[in-house]
Each structure stands twice: as C-alpha cells, then as structure tokens.
Amino acid sequence: MSVVANPLHPLFAAGVEDIDLREALGSTEVREIERLMDEKSVLVFRGQPLSQDQQIAFARNFGPLEGGFIKVNQRPSRFKYAELADISNVSLDGKVAQRDAREVVGNFANQLWHSDSSFQQPAARYSMLSAVVVPPSGGDTEFCDMRAAYDALPRDLQSELEGLRAEHYALNSRFLLGDTDYSEAQRNAMPPVNWPLVRTHAGSGRKFLFIGAHASHVEGLPVAEGRMLLAELLEHATQREFVYRHRWNVGDLVMWDNRCVLHRGRRYDISARRELRRATTLDDAVV
C-alpha cells in the first residue's frame, strides 16, 4: 500500500492521507514513511485520535524509544509509559496547572527553537506529537528546515563552520529563561555533550545545521563570539522561507526528524487546557 503525501511547504513538510495509525503498520508502510521522512522531514497525520498504547506502538516501528529530559525532570508522570513526554499545562490531578507550577514553567523552554534531546549522545531521531486537547487559539508549533537553511548560507560561512562543534546541555534552554530551580542531582543528571555545527543527514546525504536552544557555546571560540555565531545561524535558519507553522486540531499527529529540523511551540493562554503527548525514537549516530 502506497502512502499518499501532499506538500505543506515549498521546501519540506507534507500531509499524509489514507492511513490509519491506530492499526498495525506493515513493513511496506513503515519503509514508505521512512522514505518520506528522509525527503520531507515533517509529516502531518490528521484525524488520528491515538490512545497511549497506539501511539507507543506506532512509534516503536521506527526504533527504540528514548526518555530524554525524564532523567532531569525526576517527577511522576500522568502516563502509563515512561517514554511518553507530557507536553501540557496539566497537573497530576488532571486540572490545569497554576501559572507558576513546574508543569507550566518548564514547558516555556519548548517555545525556544530546539531539537529534542540534542543534549545527549545518541540524540533523538523522530518525534511523534499527538494532540489530545488544544486551546481555542494559539499553541501552534513551528518547524524550520535546517537542510535548506544550510544550503542557503554563503559558501565562505559554510567553510568556516566545518570542524566547529557546539556544547549542548539539557538545562541550557531553561537557564536562558531564568528557570534555575533545579537540584544539584538534576543539574548533573545529563552531562553536556558536543555536536558538530554541520552534520550530514544519513537518509538524504544532505548537510544540515545542528544548533538550537540546548547549544550553550562553540568549543574553541571565546564564549561571546561563539554565542553570537549561534545566534546569527539561528536568525538565518528561522527566516519565514524555511518555516512551516502547524495549527493543531485534536487528533493530529505530527512526526519530525530532529536531526535536520528545529521546532518550537507558540504562545497561548495558559489558563486554557493544552494537552499533547510525545514519543521519541533514539538515533544511532554519535558524531
């Protein structure tokens, strides 16, 4: 069975039709989705009201699952699977959390451009985010194409970036927002790792920028110079021409490739309920 995909952006991202993710996928469908991911890097599946079991089963088609920030979070989950990340403003009692609650404050970092789990090696490959409850307005998610962004860099800057590496740290994005209320154990739960600023995508052979809010500095450069370089690259990569904005409906599942896509949530009224669940697969690359 072929998988039908319609473009959502001139450079990347596609909507997938005529497939029911609640049912077990055959090997042909899995391979076709992987092929589309190599080409489009973001796939949108509408009308997929998945249970936790169904979301986990779908995600496991694409490799082992990873927990990412769970090691730092060190708090109970509302979900039956530790591998499901709670992207919501809902507390353990099922009510919308208070504005200053950890569930809310911690998730503000999701509104910075980032790649899931770039703070570990191996990092994440695919993330699959399922919309359970969406607010009346706002709360969209944006994605930017880091392969196209690299291609559009001046050749001299491309050459300058070769061989440079950035340090990524799990709490860097939180610290940027003044969210520093973490114990020593939490701060040390995931030591920093470093990644090349430019990597090659295994599925397409294309080069891409690997940066984002987890990247704290560039190794071998003065801190200020390195941070300005990271800021310049991020400003370039997140121009409108490289960005797809997804407006959520209940039952949407969006799947993206963390290696060559950055994403961020957008602002919404945090007194309105917003519930999304994310499953993420582990990559096999250590560079």
Curated annotation (Swiss-Prot):
Q: Which reaction does it catalyse?
A: (2,4-dichlorophenoxy)acetate + 2-oxoglutarate + O2 = 2,4-dichlorophenol + glyoxylate + succinate + CO2
The known PTMs are summarized as: Hydroxylated on Trp-113; inactivates the enzyme.
Q: What class of enzyme is it?
A: oxidoreductase
The annotated pathway is:
Xenobiotic degradation; (2,4-dichlorophenoxy)acetate degradation
InterPro entries annotated for this entry? TauD-like_sf, TauD/TfdA-like, TfdA_dioxygenase
What is the regulation of this protein's activity? Answer: Activated by ascorbate.
Name of the molecule in the record: Alpha-ketoglutarate-dependent 2,4-dichlorophenoxyacetate dioxygenase
Origin species, per record, is Cupriavidus pinatubonensis (strain JMP 134 / LMG 1197)
- Upper taxonomic lineage: Bacteria, Pseudomonadati, Pseudomonadota, Betaproteobacteria, Burkholderiales
